[in-house]
């Protein structure tokens, strides 16, 4: 593990190929759909989550055990990725994994806003970013959204959250804060590439991957704003670094959803997002659209991995795939706990 020296893409990609083959597939998900939470935890013991389940089983049971084991297993997996990585790859991966800092900040915001208890919020935190356990505990101990914003002073989220907090107070909506967190994360990834970089250079491939993710995030955020009715300036929460939209046109696109959908359809992502747009039009469901967006991003990341097999692309694609696995297992366990039908739970899963 070192941020200096040459990148060891070939070595890390070879190890990831083995790990990716062990991800849950359709057969595993079908089995989980018929299990209770206790059975799901036992099923996880026979998988890569064994160490996490074993270490937590004396303190937790049922749904709590599943939740904590998933997050601990995810954090351990990404710690391993970092430990294998060298040079530019280490730097690229470490920055990318800050997404879990963003996730944790938004999770604490949501918990405080909904008056959830501390244990419920803690169960959703993933210790895989740069924030250490002590700082996460500090965020968890906050008694208000404003206290969390103050605690984040000096982090990459600092300057983004200050103006967003005023909008949050005016609108009583988390949308401004969540969009500000996304902007802080993505814009600090520095996805732009030097003009002289070759198309298959490490800089260019990293930029291409992140540009697609930013474009998909802007599409998601634009539609959320269009549906939320919150009277904030959409351009103020636009994420720089994509190619799908310009900040100057966001207000018009958010106000006229048909124009927004047409823009996505006519873009370079039109084919990848056709299923997502169809889901949006047929069911008028933003959740369905967001799930389809997630599937499209997984597919696009796999495409980049196929075209550039010895690069950062397969590494970041594996991060996305592992995240989706955890999200799917959690959705199944929560659905079973809530008494949802198999079809209802199936609709919550993101699979290719």
From Swiss-Prot:
Keyword Acyltransferase: no
Record-level GO cellular component terms: plasma membrane; proton-transporting V-type ATPase, V0 domain
Keyword annotations of the record: ATP synthesis, Cell membrane, Hydrogen ion transport, Ion transport, Membrane, Transport
BP GO terms, sorted: proton motive force-driven plasma membrane ATP synthesis
Location in the cell: Cell membrane
Pfam families: vATP-synt_AC39
InterPro entries attached to this UniProt entry: ATPase_csu/dsu_sf (IPR036079), ATPase_V0-cplx_csu (IPR014272), ATPase_V0-cplx_csu/dsu (IPR002843), V-ATPase_V0D/AC39_subunit (IPR050873), V-type_ATPase_csu/dsu (IPR035067), V-type_ATPase_csu/dsu_dom_3 (IPR044911)
MF-aspect GO terms: ATP binding; proton-transporting ATP synthase activity, rotational mechanism; proton-transporting ATPase activity, rotational mechanism
Membrane topology: Peripheral membrane protein
Database matches in PANTHER family: V-TYPE ATP SYNTHASE SUBUNIT C
Family: Belongs to the V-ATPase V0D/AC39 subunit family.
Assembly description: Has multiple subunits with at least A(3), B(3), C, D, E, F, H, I and proteolipid K(x).
Function: Component of the A-type ATP synthase that produces ATP from ADP in the presence of a proton gradient across the membrane.
Protein name per its UniProtKB record: A-type ATP synthase subunit C
Organism per entry: Halobacterium salinarum (strain ATCC 700922 / JCM 11081 / NRC-1) (Halobacterium halobium)
Taxonomic lineage from the root: Archaea, Methanobacteriati, Methanobacteriota, Stenosarchaea group, Halobacteria
């Amino acid at each position: 593990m070192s941020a200096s020296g040459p990148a060891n893409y070939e070595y890390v990609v070879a190890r990831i190929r083995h790990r990716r083959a062990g991800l849950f597939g359709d057969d595993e998900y079908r089995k989980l759909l018929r299990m209770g939470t206790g059975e799901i935890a036992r099923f996880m013991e026979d998988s890569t989550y064994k160490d996490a389940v074993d270490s937590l089983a004396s303190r937790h049971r049922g749904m709590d055990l599943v939740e904590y084991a998933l997050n601990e297993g995810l954090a351990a997996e990404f710690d391993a990725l970092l430990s294998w990585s060298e040079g530019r790859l280490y730097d690229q991966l470490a920055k990318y994994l800050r997404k879990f800092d963003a996730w944790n900040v938004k999770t604490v915001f949501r918990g405080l806003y909904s008056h959830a208890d501390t244990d419920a919020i803690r169960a959703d935190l993933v210790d895989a970013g740069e924030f250490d356990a002590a700082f996460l505990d500090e965020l968890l101990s906050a008694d208000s959204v404003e206290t969390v914003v103050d605690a984040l002073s000096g982090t990459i989220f600092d300057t983004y959250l200050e103006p967003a907090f005023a909008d949050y107070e005016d609108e009583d909506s988390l949308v401004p804060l969540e969009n500000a967190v996304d902007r802080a994360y993505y814009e600090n990834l520095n996805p732009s590439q030097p003009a002289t970089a070759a198309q298959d250079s490490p800089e260019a491939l990293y930029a291409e991957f992140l540009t697609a993710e930013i474009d998909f995030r802007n599409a998601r955020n634009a539609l959320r704003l269009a549906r939320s009715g919150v009277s904030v300036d959409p351009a103020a929460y636009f994420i720089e670094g994509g190619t799908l939209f310009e900040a100057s046109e966001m207000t018009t696109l958010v106000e006229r959803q048909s124009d927004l959908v047409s823009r996505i359809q006519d873009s370079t992502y039109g084919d990848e997002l056709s299923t997502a747009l169809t889901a949006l039009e047929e069911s008028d469901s933003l959740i369905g659209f967001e799930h389809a967006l997630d599937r499209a991003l997984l597919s696009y990341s796999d495409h980049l991995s196929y075209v550039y097999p010895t690069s950062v692309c397969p590494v970041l694609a594996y991060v996305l795939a592992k995240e989706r696995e955890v999200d799917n297992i959690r959705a199944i366990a929560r659905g079973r706990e809530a008494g949802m039908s198999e079809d209802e739970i199936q609709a919550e899963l993101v699979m290719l």
